[in-house]
């Protein structure tokens, strides 16, 4: 009788031990949205100086300036949060980076005229140049966001190939810079230390804290 009790006690103990693991090898963990950062590095660990300071923007620059503008655009961008997350996961890009580009380029679409910038040259939430990229879909559609995010990933991969010894952070920053100004303009790490890239990373960190 005693041996039987000991046996079942051991079985219960083993079961409890296995149950202490958060998930088995056959199960995938359910990641909190704030933990998802895609395939191109964790932006929360990346250094940035924020928007460039100059004589005309002493008060609205640096990390505080970037965060201020990101917060101002939050209300306009919030309705696209689910869409941004879907597109981000499809392309393995941090949704916060997509949100940051939307903030920087179109203020969440609030300054666009039928999807176009004031010169009629760039289209959509992420502002694709019509001559370079030939935008598709409605300006605030999943099709547009997917096209633009796909272009961003192409640029990141091109930088990875061109500069294989660069760090993960440099590859992402290089891809962002190439998305804005082209790959040809990038030759050294100093070329990716620019206003656009630093501003995007700072804004992205803000949006990551807002659960993007």
Curated annotation (Swiss-Prot):
Q: Does the keyword Glycosyltransferase apply?
A: no
Q: Which residues form the active site?
A: 105
Task: State which Enzyme Commission number(s) the record gives.
Answer: 3.2.1.-
The disulfide bonds in this chain are 39-92, 53-61
The entry's note on the tissues where this protein occurs is:
Strong expression detected in the eye and weak expression in the testis. No expression is observed in any other tissues.
According to the UniProt record, one GO cellular component term is: extracellular region
Give the UniProt keywords, A-Z.
Disulfide bond, Glycosidase, Hydrolase, Secreted, Signal
| Subcellular location, record wording | Secreted
User: What's any GO biological process attached to this entry?
Assistant: peptidoglycan catabolic process
InterPro entries tied to this protein: Glyco_hydro_23, Lysozyme-like_dom_sf
Q: Would you say which domain of life the source belongs to?
A: Eukaryota
Q: Name one GO molecular function term.
A: lysozyme activity
**Name by which UniProt lists this protein:** Lysozyme g-like protein 2
Keyword Disulfide bond part of the UniProt annotation: yes
Q: Which family does the record claim for this protein?
A: Belongs to the glycosyl hydrolase 23 family.
Role played: May act as a potent antibacterial protein that may play a role in the innate immunity.
Signal sequence region: 1-19
């Amino acid at each position: 009788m005693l041996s039987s009790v000991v046996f079942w006690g051991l079985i219960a103990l083993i079961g409890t031990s296995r149950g202490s693991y958060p998930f088995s090898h056959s199960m995938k963990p359910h990641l909190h949205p704030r933990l998802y950062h895609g395939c191109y590095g964790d932006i929360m660990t990346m250094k940035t100086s924020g928007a460039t300071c100059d004589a005309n923007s002493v008060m609205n620059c640096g990390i505080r300036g970037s965060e201020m503008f990101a917060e101002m655009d939050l209300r306009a961008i919030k309705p696209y949060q689910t869409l941004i997350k879907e597109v981000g996961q499809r392309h393995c890009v941090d949704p916060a980076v997509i949100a940051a580009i939307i903030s920087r380029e179109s203020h969440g679409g609030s300054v666009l005229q039928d999807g176009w910038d004031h010169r009629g040259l760039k289209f959509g939430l992420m502002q694709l140049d019509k001559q370079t990229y030939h935008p598709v879909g409605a300006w605030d559609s999943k099709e547009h966001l997917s096209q633009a995010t796909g272009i961003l990933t192409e640029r990141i991969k091109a930088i990875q190939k061109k500069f294989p010894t660069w760090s993960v952070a440099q590859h992402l920053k290089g891809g962002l810079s190439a998305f804005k100004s082209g790959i040809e303009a990038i030759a050294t790490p100093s070329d990716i230390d620019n206003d656009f890239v630093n501003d995007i990373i700072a804004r992205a960190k803000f949006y990551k804290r807002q659960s993007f």
